A protein has these predicted regions:
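Nucleotidyltransferase catalytic core that binds NTPs
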Residues: 1-159
Length: 159
């Protein structure tokens, strides 16, 4: 197994759950550092209609999780941009500022992603960033958690 200097992982982390933690733990096994790219609030509102926690709150939590070295909030140039390419670019520029070495970076993907369904794949190739697959199964979803909590609250109030 190749060992990287940096493994990038990304997500909404809204809210963070055990699947995210498994992804970070597996990334940590493959890299000296794990850098997390968080989707911003606008991205989440465009995808889900709302954000459960603010981007600053999510970044604060993620930055304190064991194994996470750096965090970046992705700020796409346009609201229609559904990628984290802006965050990848920020990570590459940070790497070049901090390390006087050839880029040793991978973009890690969870179990719900595979070749062909990751819009950042070509962008990563342009920077010689390797793609790593199966950093955990889709064991949980932030949307599932919010829906479950909402339904439980609704049932309790109507019970």
């Amino acid at each position: 197994m190749k060992k990287y200097k940096v493994m990038l992982v990304s997500g909404g982390f809204d809210p963070v759950h055990k699947g995210h933690l498994e992804m970070i733990e597996r990334a940590e096994q493959m890299a000296e550092e794990v850098w997390v790219i968080l989707n911003n609030d606008t991205w989440l509102r465009n995808k889900k209609g709302k954000s459960f926690m603010s981007e600053k709150e999510r970044e604060y939590i993620m930055s304190r999780i064991k194994g996470v070295t750096k965090t970046f909030i992705c700020n796409p140039r346009t609201p229609s941009d559904k990628t984290v390419c802006d965050g990848i670019y920020s990570a590459v520029m940070t790497y070049r500022r901090e390390y006087d070495s050839e880029l040793s970076m991978a973009f890690g993907n969870g179990g719900d992603r595979g070749k062909g369904n990751v819009p950042e794949e070509d962008y990563c190739k342009s920077y010689d960033i390797d793609m790593v697959w199966n950093l955990g199964d889709k064991v949980q979803s932030s949307s599932w958690l919010i829906e479950k909590a909402t339904n439980s609250a609704y049932s309790s109030s109507n019970g």
